[in-house]
A protein has these predicted regions:
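Alpha-helical transmembrane segments of multi-pass inner-membrane proteins
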Residues: 1-142, 194
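Surface-exposed loop/turn and secondary-structure junction residues enriched for glycine/proline
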Residues: 32-35, 45-48, 54, 146-154, ...
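Flexible juxtamembrane loops connecting transmembrane helices in multi-pass membrane enzymes
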Residues: 40-44, 102, 133-173, 196
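TM-adjacent membrane-interface loops and short helices in multi-pass inner/ER membrane proteins
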Residues: 47, 159, 166-204
């Protein structure tokens, strides 16, 4: 319980920082990391995907505390909203996959009667998450026009889902590197060596 409370508190603070970065308030608040030219908020993490993963852990901590009834429901709901909002701001595709896995696992737990969280609450939070992902680009543009503030631009879900496919090419190239030396490899921490050698005969 103590660990869940710490994770929830730090996750909520992380979410608040991410929201401030989205609104470009980070440049005016002492002690907060200035995003500068970064597009996706990352709060006190160096990378948006890392932040999103931690925020999902915080959400799971929130569910645990709800099940144990250690914190009032309205407090947990407020924290959950901040966490979900920040996850949507991160535009992390990793979080989309994680949410899908958690939903499947949660549905199984509900079927077995191991958790008391109602299925319609879960669907409501999922709908909120999807709605935030869909509406954030519109909200970002509107806030920028109304306030004349250059806030961090967010991409649409379609752009995030289909954009930057270069990662797949890199994975394909690394697969060829593994097939070239399946037994002895390239040595500890020698990924760059593998990349250089495979580039001679396979361009990713």
């Amino acid at each position: 319980i103590g660990f869940s409370m710490v994770v929830l508190l730090s996750g909520t603070l992380t979410g608040i920082i991410a929201i401030c970065q989205w609104l470009t308030l980070d440049a005016h608040i002492p002690g907060m990391v200035n995003m500068q030219n970064a597009v996706r908020p990352y709060a006190n993490f160096a990378q948006p995907n890392n932040m999103a993963t931690f925020l999902i852990m915080s959400l799971l901590g929130c569910v645990y505390l709800y099940e144990k009834q250690k914190i009032k429901t309205w407090v947990l709901s407020l924290c959950s909203f901040i966490l979900i909002f920040a996850v949507a701001l991160s535009q992390s595709r990793t979080s989309w996959v994680a949410c899908l896995c958690i939903l499947v696992y949660g549905a199984y737990q509900q079927y077995k009667g191991l958790i008391t969280l109602k299925w319609y609450y879960t669907l409501a939070w999922l709908a909120l998450f999807i709605g935030l992902i869909a509406l954030l680009p519109i909200a970002t543009q509107w806030i920028g026009q109304v306030t004349n503030v250059d806030i961090a631009q967010t991409k649409t879900a379609a752009e995030r889902a289909t954009g930057d496919m270069s990662r797949l090419a890199i994975w394909e190239q690394m697969l060829h590197a593994i097939l070239d030396r399946p037994w002895w490899g390239y040595g500890w921490n020698q990924t760059s060596v593998a990349y250089t050698l495979v580039s001679d005969h396979f361009q990713g």
